[in-house]
Amino acid sequence: QIGNHIFDMVDAVAAKEQKKALDYYYDLLTLKEPPMRILYLLTRQFRILMEVKEMDRTGVPPKEIAAKVGIMPFLVGKYRTQAKAFTRKELRGIVEAGVQTEEDVKTGKMGDILSVELFLVQYSSKREK
């Protein structure tokens, strides 16, 4: 269940559907999922997208992509689709922001619930043209 919510949350971020991304987050909080676990899973998901995008760009076959990133082969297509919504630079920035957000919480600079909220708001906002 949490995996589906995380995947859906990333879809919402990719589509710049901020309300939907936050709704999934609040659903997970209601289900008593710790904010830091949610952040970890989101960051992991974006890291996988970054790896899939890079391997896809260099022509790595789907089965090999699945083996290298640790996902089921039938999921490669879904990850490719999600990855297309982002540039490599955006994915790298999101992963770095996830790591920084986790550090900010662990060092007491930010509260856990708010920090994940801000992370989602930042990356699900409409892009400036």
Each PLM stretch: what is its role?
Residues Y79-M110:
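C-terminal capping/gating helix-and-loop segments adjacent to ligand/active sites or protein-protein/ligand interfaces
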Residues Q1-E90, R127-E128:
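Small-residue-rich helix-loop
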Residues L39, T43-F46, V95, V99, ...:
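Generic structural concept
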Residues K109-K129:
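Short, charged, intrinsically disordered terminal tails
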Residues E33, E102, E117:
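Acidic-residue sensor for enzyme active/binding pockets
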Residues K20, A97-Q100, Y123:
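Residues within well-formed alpha-helices
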